[in-house]
Amino acid sequence: KKRETGAFERAMVLKMLKAYNPNSTFNHKKMVSLLQLNAYYEQLNRLNIRLEDIIEWFFDSYLKENFEIENFSISMPSKDSTFFEKCKSVLPEIDHILKEYKYYVEDGQVDPELVSISSEHMFFKDIPSKVKDKYVYLKNSDYNNLIDYYFFSDQCMLAYLENLDNKYDNFFKLIVKEDIKYNDFPEYDKKDLDWLIKEKLIFENDKGLLKIKNEERIMVYAELHYKEVISYWRKSEKIRNEIKQMIKENRLEIGSSLFSRNEQDYFNFYLNMSEFIDGYDIRNSNLHGTQIGDRKSDVHYSRYLQIVL
């Protein structure tokens, strides 16, 4: 996420156009998640349980028994396959499952014959969801950028008051947690406060304290700042109504894809070069024999975990 890139890293690290540009936080999370999955994979093996069998059971049996969804199928690598072979065989199965799901959403059922003859290449952004209006995103605009800056940026001076020892790193935390007044701020900050008051984002209450005026709206902005996406149907009716109003005002947009945009970018970064020039390109390199390392290299174990992850 953009917010996880610190000011020093933003200033010092060269960013490429059309690149994913993973930051240090991303790399740390990747390392931790791989270690966790490795531990899980090894523990299952010690219990004589294959992760591949669990995945097959989910698609072949669980969906049918619990949701009456038939004809989903997946063929995972055998126990004796090398990790090089596992990488090559599991990647087409990802496309296969995505095709099955796409047909299920569009037709209400999975037709194995249609799936088998389909030559359509699956792009993550094109996979629809059964849930309409699933994800909410912030529209890129000067207005939204200003709100994000004033409330959530650690570079905005509204966050820092000397009488509070500068203990908050953004204005949102300050106004929520402290009793602050307009005149607590230096003169050079007051024009920014005036703008927020004019836009009816904050107000002075009868005690002269600055408070958030439309809490639901600012909570929407806060979640989009910290998570970059909102799962629409997981929010309260009050928040959903505010989101609808913000969509009418052209502040937000909503989509119905299976994966959020961040998830799409994450998968594309690892599996192909369709979006980012610095991607791992695991899918194409393995399917076309241009992968790094020989066939017995440990790199294939790591890549297999990344694919499963």
Language model features: what each stretch is:
Residues 28-181:
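Short, amphipathic alpha-helical interface elements at domain boundaries
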Residues 2-75, 105, 265-309:
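Charge-enriched, short contiguous segments at helix-coil
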Residues 115, 119-123, 127-309:
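Amphipathic, oligomerization/interface secondary-structure segments
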